[in-house]
């Protein structure tokens, strides 16, 4: 059927119009992010009903989630109602309003369930089945695996013994059980699981497949070997330009000869590669060489870096791909074949027994849905059944949303109920393979890719492909920068998608022309001497600062009205790969009193209230578990004190269990009577609850515990009470859900909880935040898919990819099967096998590809502006990223495959065109102006040092109360209002005096003026600082733990306070003797010597400043002072708004009648890229100018003489003021 001509003035683009009306063949719509695919899908359904006269219940619409299905059905229903109102006489539309309720707009699982319910007789199952919960299903599967393994232990087949030797430890079969479970899930994602398992052994037995694996490895290794050879040649070219490096060139020439032999004839000579040593050690670069090439220092470093890169690449090939010769790899495969075959047999036994258990309990899981549906729709030979033919006749079109996330079983089901072949079929598929991020759910993006490559734009002879590329969500800056990144990051080799003109995003939203560049923020961590925060905590704090900046300066554009409004909390989302940073972010936002919500499925079992209830349940089930019993005793419910627990244990120190100690204490005549009564009540409770649990389900036991001890009421009254209450009710509801499963009893419930905790399947904190609540949200990229936000902060870019699965002894892959390491049972040594090496390499490639697609999803969530947050230890690492090698239009394949994290790639791509220091052969273009508008990046790259990020605004917000809250409470009470107004209007006559403390230190004054210069209210900062603890560090920590930076600073000042000044300077031996003397005199601790920076003190002793002081007429150390601030600040006479300044000057000396003061500084500082000593000196002077000015003015006030000063930095040197 031809596509109708598009009228003038319609809202649809040409591609959308084609997507709505294309028919007569299978259609694949590649719908980029924000391209309106859902609107197109709904419109296509409506036009099928309105234009083609098709009944809505004769369309099968498959969505990815139940929520999507409900929303789509609602949209279709609304459109039908609108059309019916416009044409009330239309009988067809009236019928659709009735049939919409039977319309098959659902997930594929829901369709399969309906199929099973209608045709259960074909399956010979009880029609009264129910669906098992995920937790129940896992428990039953675990139980089945345990039983099957026990059966095979009874048989003790030699292959089974070898398997257990390899995959089990001395302590448990946990790893073995995990591998069996993974194999089960992989197998059932195939149309014929048994057949898939049977084929696992084929590569281990057939040489033809082994040869294919050798070729696969050869092709992969060629990428790295070629890159290694390029790096080696660059190193040679650079060294060739230098003097006195003949030995270096000789080593490189030998390596070039070896590499030339490996690559001879354009093929990789594997035997030569494995039979020779590569990467000889390069001679050291001596001072003589540096002197001879003093004008080429950067080139010298680059040459060394290139040779290091060569060694790294060749080492990867030899360690990861060809650690042994190919013949040895093949020989191992033959010996592994019986083990692989037996492992497949175990999984088939598990599958059979698991299915039997499910039938006996009359339960089905989602895998059963798919396989039973397939059983109904196919004959024994795999051809469509009569039932399938009837569905083919019934459904006039099948529409599939999110097609990139389907698996092979689902594809087979769809193929059974669709009509025709690709060139004349009725299957309409919508998706975006660039957003395929569910491989862990066995989604198979290759299904989409294969069709995309096979279908054509005009649909001649095959299916039709339509590209929806126009984006109606984001500003052009987001789109063009995203295009630029992926143009250089994604292709068929890494990412599995060619990011060409058809794949890229095109601007289609009606925003105004204001500039909204993407912001790439690179946070350089402060070391421990500058911050007590970890790197992750620093990043969390920095993210909060970005949020505050957005709220203060950014606005949101309303496309309907063409006007702006201020940004609010709910306009901002923080996206991360996982929830690992959630706790740090929660704390950082809490510190700033910014409403924040983590849309997390993690952390539930760590909540205090949940841990209490679980401790209670575990103690009731088995009171001999000390951790849970004592935890319950120490809780708010029973409130035993630590000294009481100590009394109990001291009386019976050798008891195995604390419960025994309690019983023994109660029976001891010397026991404290009050404590005995308390213990008797506690044990009585335990016994009472134990008896109750025998006759009642778990949820009733929990309910009784809640009511007996007012648990709900107590936790509701705490901070976050609403969420705590929801968590407690959530656990209660989970217990009800558990009782509805096939398992019963307290023990089984605890096992159920343990299984969830072990597998990381958290319930998640109960969600008490709605979609319209005004909070900043954090969510994972996976959970953000399909959503959009005005401002997206994509953080955690520097967190490494999780490659833990690649280190397992068994690697699984849907396409290739199972790769098992070879384990020599006699020698008890493991080696990579041909299959494990090949499949591990494939798995790594697929993993990095999916991580790149996750980056695409994250970037395309932003509407107004995108913030990318990366974090590095130091700025030197950025130079290496700028110089990542390229190949054509992309970052080189080897660089992408070995990239540790997203930041590695994103920064490299975006920084290349902005860097003036890298050569043209490492840039994608000589001039960014040459790049087309649609992919020309608009990005601001900022390198921020954490010590420059103000932490002064982290305040204790509990000190502030809202007057509005008080007025709201007394609303309507005029007397109260008048009294409040009278008190608030009162003007204290000495208000200025309240704003300053009566006594201040110079350091405090320094912070005050620095804060005022930054525009912050110092009064709030000062109130926060008053709360700091001043307790000394405990002695046991001082002796055993590592000293903090401030403690080392104090120690260094103590040493300097007593340091002798001698004209002939003291020697290093004398310095050690002096330190030992301080220890003998107990001036410093005995273990302090290891923390004293001797080299820095010796540098001071050899400095000019030391010599000047040694020749001074008078020297005063640690001189305290107290002075009127009015005199120091030279305030007018009579000004009463003054304070007393107190302080301590490290050292004062008099030379030639002039007074000088010296202030020692142990600060560390970052020597940032390109900074000279002069610039560092200026920076350090500016940092302490206020403090030094006060010292100078104070001394001049006291002495009534001109005073000069020095700053001495142990890590920099002398600065004269």
Curated annotation (Swiss-Prot):
Domain UvrD-like helicase C-terminal residue range list: 476-786
Top-level taxonomic group: Bacteria
Gene Ontology CC terms: cytosol; DNA helicase complex
Reactions catalysed, as given in the entry: Couples ATP hydrolysis with the unwinding of duplex DNA by translocating in the 3'-5' direction; ATP + H2O = ADP + phosphate + H(+)
Residues covered by the UvrD-like helicase ATP-binding domain: 10-475
Claim: Hydrolase is one of the keywords in the record: yes
MF term (GO), any: 3'-5' DNA helicase activity
Keywords per UniProt: ATP-binding, DNA damage, DNA repair, DNA-binding, Exonuclease, Helicase, Hydrolase, Isomerase, Nuclease, Nucleotide-binding
Residues where ATP binds: 31-38
Family per similarity comment: Belongs to the helicase family. AddA subfamily.
Protein name: ATP-dependent helicase/nuclease subunit A
